[in-house]
Every structure is written in structure tokens, then in C-alpha cells.
A protein has these predicted regions:
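Transmembrane beta-strand segments of outer-membrane beta-barrel domains in Gram-negative
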Residues: 11-15, 22-24, 37-44, 51-54, ...
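C-terminal transmembrane beta-barrel domains of outer membrane proteins
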Residues: 52, 125-136, 141-178, 189, ...
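Generic "edge-of-domain/loop-turn" microfeature
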Residues: 8, 13-15, 91, 106-108, ...
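Periplasmic polypeptide-binding modules associated with outer-membrane biogenesis and secretion
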Residues: 1-119, 188, 366
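A short, surface-exposed beta-strand/turn
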Residues: 116-122, 131, 221
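Transmembrane beta-strand segments of Gram-negative outer membrane beta-barrel proteins
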Residues: 3-8, 105-121, 144-148, 196-203, ...
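Generic recognition of flexible, low-complexity loop/linker segments
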Residues: 70, 85-89, 99-101, 116-118, ...
Length: 456
């Protein structure tokens, strides 16, 4: 069969598919030879409809192109359902098909609320957030999200000149475009890559008895998937984080930060820029079976992650002959910036024995190297061991680095290298109960001999 004509119906009612009311058309237009029928107002730009179409008039019918079209429209958050129907052209000796792309509009705007209570060692608190989401911001299925969050916790046992309780306020805004956006790139390339582009801003204000901290960030990233959703890629083209410490309690500073043995802790309570780029890759052999919650069977997952920070800033500072501060660091707007390389690898495999028993294997490794403008990693980029997702015989952040036993007074059990491995036998017991036997192995280490982490 040859494709004769392709038409769009944007207000298809899938719940009334068997009745005449399933298609309501009050108006129409033609765009680049494609008829577009709609009810009251066209909620998607015609260019968005045609750019995601892979069924071309005058070409042979191709099932792969039909599935690609379904996949493209499935990525548009403004749509709820997509149905493509083909009808033979009623002509003698004709082998032509008319295609109708029938789209069902989704809910474009929503507001959500969340409330939670906390109890940290007897200190009670509460948190609340409100989020607004618009899934068709500029009539191109762009998803805009804005979120506000607030938290409060009564902190006992600490005397401070700053504040006696914990208060947190945060705001977040992101916008996601269902297409690849970059200057000087051809339209044909943008159509082929099928990536989404995301821009985001975040602001977080924290007030504790020990300190006041502000974290602000901005990001620009791309995401796309291939091979029937088995592979997923993400590129963080630019991710800027700014850590600002406007005030630190004098007692906390004297007891912890000004001691030579707490160099790692002091480093993480200083103002700092982190300007990074990164790439991550996920491969899941289950593919769409995992998304559809259907029987998965034997499967495995591979995760790779690589990121670097500070290299461009360091090169500019070096070539520009900029002066270093008293700590021997180059600065951006008088604020030191981090510089490091970090890579992670993770492999997990699920082996089904029968409908009640299975084996799970896991291996993970990571290394992060501070260099150039930094002698240490930022706290958020260091590795931790112990807890439910690591070596389960230790509490979270309570193992390592190396043979270092840790200090209960400060959170200095972190490192630059991490290895984790486990094997687990899982079985169904009865009703909703499951059982498991597992063996875990792993630890973290430091690349350098830090004096406040002997044996690390």
C-alpha cells in the first residue's frame, strides 16, 4: 500500500469511540498539505503535529514509521491518547491508504499539595509543598513546573546565637521542551534526535542553630531514549551550583571548623561554585516490559555516569593570569570554584529461577578525583557507604573510608573511591510476605591521605 493522504483530528474522544460523538469537528485548516480538524480551538501548533509525524504521503506503508509516530506523540505531555487509523481509498485498482492521526487532549494544568511530619531523635517538625504544572505552556507540549516548599523542625539541645530551630524555604522552576534545542543546528537533525530539552532554576534557604546556608542552581540538559526504551541518555550541558554561607555560629566554628583535624568539614562550610557538565547512560534489557509492568523475567541494567567541573574556568583563569586567593585557589566573583573528574559504573542482574524464587546480583564502582583548583571534593560529590543501598551491615554513612573508624561528632565518613557488590536470594513466602538472604561487600577510600581521616 501507498500512503495517499494524512489528516489530523485533534479532539478525538476515546471514551466514545463506538459512537458518532467520538469525533467533534467545528473548524479546520491546512498546513503544508496536511488537513487539521479541531473542535473549538487548536491547542497544539500545526508545526508540532507535522514535525512528530513519520508517515509521509506518497511513500509505501511502513509499520516501523507508524510505531515511530506513536512514540513521538507519546512523548507529548499535552496529549492523553493517540490512535492512527488507515482506510483504503475507494477507487478501482487502488492500493492507497488514507491515514487519520486521532489525538485525545490531556489535562494541561494541575496543582498538587504535599504535607509531611518528621521526628528526628525526638525533635518534631513539619513540611509542606505546593506545585503547579502546565503541560502545554506555549502550545508545543512544553511542560512548565513551579514548586514551593517550606519546612520547620524544633531543634533541642543546641544553644546558638543565630536560631534555635531549623527552617527551610525552597523554590524550583523547570521547563521541558519535547524537542532538541540548540543554536545553529538544522531542523532535520532536531527531528531525528528526538531529544527533550530542560532548563531549570532552584533556590534553597536553610537556617539552623549552627549556620545559615543558601544553595542556588541553574541547569540546561538533554534527555533521549532509543532501542524501544532500553537505552536512555542524559547530557547535562551546563549545571551551575552556588553554595553561600552568610552566617556560621561562633561556637560551632570554634568547636569544629577551626580545628586542624576537621579540614574536610571546614572545606564544606565555605562559599563555593560548582560549574559542571555531565553525561549519563542507562541500559535496561527489559525495555518496554518494565514500563508496562508486564512479565520481565531475566534482565539486567547497566548505568554509566561521567561528570567534570571547573576545567573551563580554570583554563580561563590560568590563561588570563588571574591571581589566587589566600588559600591558593582561583575564584569566580571572589568565590572559589570546585574542579574534579568523577565516573561511576553500576551493573545489576535479576535471574529468575521459577515463579517464586530469583537471584539478584549487583556491582558498583566509582571514583572522583579533585585536582587543579581543588584539593578536596565538595561534600555533595563524595561517596558514602552503608545503609539499605550499600553494605547493609552498617548504618548509612557509617562505614569507612578504609579502616578509619569515624568520629561521632562530625560527618567525615566519606571518600573519593567506592566499591559495592552483593548477591541476594529472593523468595515468595505467603500472601504479601517476601523473604531474602544476601551477602554484601564494599567500602569507600580516599585518594589522598587526609589528616582528619587516618587510614582512609
Amino acid at each position: 500500500y501507498t500512503i495517499n493522504k494524512v489528516s489530523f483530528i485533534t479532539d478525538y474522544n476515546v471514551l466514545q469511540a463506538s459512537t458518532q460523538n467520538s469525533i467533534e469537528v467545528n473548524d479546520s485548516l491546512h498546513y503544508k498539505g496536511f488537513p487539521i480538524y479541531y473542535k473549538d480551538k487548536l491547542y497544539l501548533r500545526p508545526k508540532v503535529l507535522t514535525n512528530n509525524l513519520r508517515i509521509t504521503p506518497g511513500t509505501l506503508y511502513n509499520e516501523q514509521n507508524v510505531q515511530r509516530t506513536y512514540s513521538n506523540y507519546g512523548r507529548l505531555q499535552a496529549l492523553k491518547y493517540t490512535n492512527i487509523r488507515f482506510f483504503e481509498v475507494q477507487q478501482s485498482d487502488s492500493a492507497k491508504l488514507n491515514a487519520y492521526v486521532m489525538l485525545t487532549r490531556g489535562k494541561h494544568q494541575s496543582v498538587s499539595f504535599e504535607v509531611e511530619g518528621t521526628n528526628s531523635a525526638g525533635d518534631l517538625g513539619a513540611a509542606a509543598s505546593v506545585a503547579f504544572q502546565h503541560r502545554n505552556m506555549f502550545k508545543g507540549s512544553e511542560t512548565f513546573m513551579f514548586k514551593l516548599r517550606g519546612a520547620y523542625e524544633a531543634v533541642s539541645g543546641l544553644q546558638s546565637s543565630l536560631n534555635q530551630d531549623y527552617i527551610e524555604l525552597g523554590a524550583e522552576a523547570t521547563i521541558n521542551f519535547p524537542r532538541f534545542m540548540f543554536p545553529f543546528v538544522s531542523s532535520d537533525f532536531k527531528r531525528r534526535i528526538r531529544a527533550t530539552t530542560e532548563f531549570g532554576l532552584q533556590y534553597n534557604y536553610q537556617m539552623r542553630p549552627e549556620f545559615t546556608r543558601i544553595v542556588a542552581s541553574a541547569g540546561w540538559s538533554y534527555k533521549w531514549g532509543v532501542q524501544q526504551q532500553r537505552s536512555q541518555h542524559r547530557i547535562d550541558l551546563l549545571d551551575i551550583n552556588y553554595l553561600y554561607m552568610p552566617s556560621i555560629d561562633q561556637t560551632f566554628k570554634e568547636d569544629y571548623l577551626e580545628k586542624d583535624e576537621n579540614y574536610i568539614l571546614k572545606y564544606n562550610y565555605e562559599d563555593r561554585f560548582i560549574v559542571r557538565t555531565g553525561y549519563s547512560y542507562i541500559y535496561n534489557s527489559a525495555g518496554r516490559a518494565l514500563m508496562n509492568n508486564s512479565g520481565i523475567g531475566n534482565s539486567y541494567t547497566i548505568r554509566l555516569n561521567f561528570e567534570s567541573a571547573g576545567n573551563l574556568l580554570y583554563a580561563v583563569a590560568k590563561l588570563g593570569g588571574m591571581k589566587k586567593n589566600a588559600s591558593g585557589e582561583y575564584t569566580l566573583l571572589n568565590i572559589p570554584f570546585a574542579q574534579y573528574l568523577k565516573g561511576d559504573f553500576d551493573f545489576a542482574k535479576n535471574l529468575v529461577i521459577d515463579n517464586r524464587n530469583s537471584l539478584a546480583f549487583h556491582f558498583g564502582a566509582g571514583i572522583a578525583i579533585p585536582y587543579g583548583n581543588a584539593t578536596m571534593l565538595p561534600f555533595e560529590k563524595r561517596y558514602f557507604s552503608g545503609g539499605a543501598n550499600s553494605v547493609r551491615g552498617w548504618s548509612v554513612r557509617n562505614l569507612g573510608p578504609g579502616s578509619f573508624p569515624g568520629d561521632n561528632n562530625v560527618m567525615n565518613q566519606s571518600g573519593d573511591i567506592k566499591l559495592d557488590a552483593s548477591i541476594e536470594y529472593r523468595t515468595r513466602l505467603f500472601w504479601k510476605f517476601r523473604g531474602a538472604l544476601f551477602v554484601d561487600a564494599g567500602n569507600i577510600w580516599t585518594i589522598r591521605d587526609y589528616k582528619d581521616q587516618p587510614g582512609g
